Amino acid sequence: MAGNALANYVQVYVMLPLDVITVDNTFEKEDETRAQLKKLTEAGADGVMIDVWWGLVEGKEPGVYDWSAYRQVFKLVQEAGLKLQAIMSCHQCGGNVGDVVNIPIPQWVRDVGKSNPDIFYTNRSGLTNIEYLTLGVDDQPLFHGRTAIQLYADYMKSFRENMADFLDAGVVVDIEVGLGPAGEMRYPSYPQSQGWVFPGVGEFICYDKYLQADFKAAAEEAGHPEWDLLDDAGTYNDTPEKTQFFADNGTYQTDKGKFFLTWYSNKLIKHGDKILDEANKVFLGCKVQLAIKVSGIHWWYNVPNHAAELTAGYYNLDDRDGYRTIAHMLTRHRASMNFTCAEMRDSEQSSEAKSAPEELVQQVLSAGWREGLNLACENALNRYDATAYNTILRNARPQGINKNGPPEHKLHGFTYLRVSDELFQEQNYTTFKTFVRRMHANLDYNPNVDPVAPLERSKAEIPIEEILEVAQPKLEPFPFDKDTDLPV
């Protein structure tokens, strides 16, 4: 029976605080971190997730990496008997929901932007966003002779070389490849730092000179040299109906609108594909799962235009699956997809945002399972209550426990956001411990669940035409139970 029950066990990881390493790239919280890890071990957690900030490690000068602070943290995690998910965080910390510290990308990279601001994502009014380099410079050798993709690849190579002992020992089991702002595969379409507030539709962010030239060339190749980038999609805090693009019968449904949306979302898919290919080469043979994070854009999901998803780069409509295409690309690399907002209920959302996090989660997970991926989730906002935990449990095993073997569907893992003093307050900690046990199908912690195989080389590149074929028809999601059968 234990073997059958074990097939229902979902691993639980917990994110370490954003500032576990200081902005000076030192580790000063050894005692505090050790105590936190002890609490997580006592709660039965499987491991922790940590942001590995590019801006700290290669912050001083190009090609000079300082891993000493991270090695100290990894050592503590190893001593605690926990596994580690490492995020290759090539974005800035600061400017997004929950960012409590400011860790910019390396100064020498930002210096390139002083003479060439187009290395950064740019909106239609010319505002640049310094959180992450535009995917328009992925292949441009602007950084002391290196392209952006070479910067990311070299960073990962240095990580592999300097953390080889932790990789070999099976401590690091997951490499989440950062692909955009907040480490998510998306455009910076809703930046709080530039005045966006929920539930604004956001903006299309493709007006740096590299992406402008790319669009112009694509339009000419398609026989439409007269097409320019959009000028009718509004600004960050508009509602869809205030814009010509998203309005009923708006531009998004015209040939030009469809061409633009396909181009914009394809650029993002290719960006992820190229960087995952580099990550695969770097970690080849390591016992790690490669992963990416997709953002949970749940506002305006309940209207036909899905405006906020479209500006973020997810070309998802009522008749087009914008997540299945991403999942299909991931099959090439056997990579997993990590999705957010697993704790949210529709009933908790304001009606004017036309928000539907539950349906969104069901769509995205169903798309990933149909493509045969390992899927993971995390919560978007700090929650300590049974309602949130029970929603996560429902999404982790949507058809419930199977006493005779693997459940019909289950998450590969869940990452809880995040370690804090509040989490360890008596009542919160007690509830959290119960939650972990329920995720483990009421079994004790087991370090041998879902062992990770050595990484194999990525398969041949999937042509974009083939990726687009899975977008339509948009299939109904798998049925999800209304409530979990193992509540907290």
Swiss-Prot record:
<keyword id="KW-0624">Polysaccharide degradation</keyword>
<feature type="binding site">
    <location>
        <position position="298"/>
    </location>
    <ligand>
        <name>substrate</name>
    </ligand>
</feature>
<keyword id="KW-0378">Hydrolase</keyword>
<feature type="binding site">
    <location>
        <position position="293"/>
    </location>
    <ligand>
        <name>substrate</name>
    </ligand>
</feature>
<keyword id="KW-0326">Glycosidase</keyword>
<dbReference type="GO" id="GO:0000272">
    <property type="term" value="P:polysaccharide catabolic process"/>
</dbReference>
<feature type="binding site">
    <location>
        <position position="340"/>
    </location>
    <ligand>
        <name>substrate</name>
    </ligand>
</feature>
<dbReference type="GO" id="GO:0016161">
    <property type="term" value="F:beta-amylase activity"/>
</dbReference>
<feature type="active site" description="Proton donor">
    <location>
        <position position="184"/>
    </location>
</feature>
<feature type="binding site">
    <location>
        <position position="99"/>
    </location>
    <ligand>
        <name>substrate</name>
    </ligand>
</feature>
<feature type="binding site">
    <location>
        <begin position="379"/>
        <end position="380"/>
    </location>
    <ligand>
        <name>substrate</name>
    </ligand>
</feature>
<dbReference type="InterPro" id="IPR001371">
    <property type="entry name" value="Glyco_hydro_14B_pln"/>
</dbReference>
<comment type="similarity">
    <text>Belongs to the glycosyl hydrolase 14 family.</text>
</comment>
<protein>
    <recommendedName>
        <fullName>Beta-amylase</fullName>
        <ecNumber>3.2.1.2</ecNumber>
    </recommendedName>
</protein>
<dbReference type="Pfam" id="PF01373">
    <property type="entry name" value="Glyco_hydro_14"/>
</dbReference>
<keyword id="KW-0119">Carbohydrate metabolism</keyword>
<dbReference type="InterPro" id="IPR001554">
    <property type="entry name" value="Glyco_hydro_14"/>
</dbReference>
<feature type="active site" description="Proton acceptor">
    <location>
        <position position="378"/>
    </location>
</feature>
<feature type="binding site">
    <location>
        <position position="418"/>
    </location>
    <ligand>
        <name>substrate</name>
    </ligand>
</feature>
<dbReference type="InterPro" id="IPR017853">
    <property type="entry name" value="Glycoside_hydrolase_SF"/>
</dbReference>
<dbReference type="InterPro" id="IPR018238">
    <property type="entry name" value="Glyco_hydro_14_CS"/>
</dbReference>
<feature type="binding site">
    <location>
        <position position="51"/>
    </location>
    <ligand>
        <name>substrate</name>
    </ligand>
</feature>
<feature type="binding site">
    <location>
        <position position="91"/>
    </location>
    <ligand>
        <name>substrate</name>
    </ligand>
</feature>
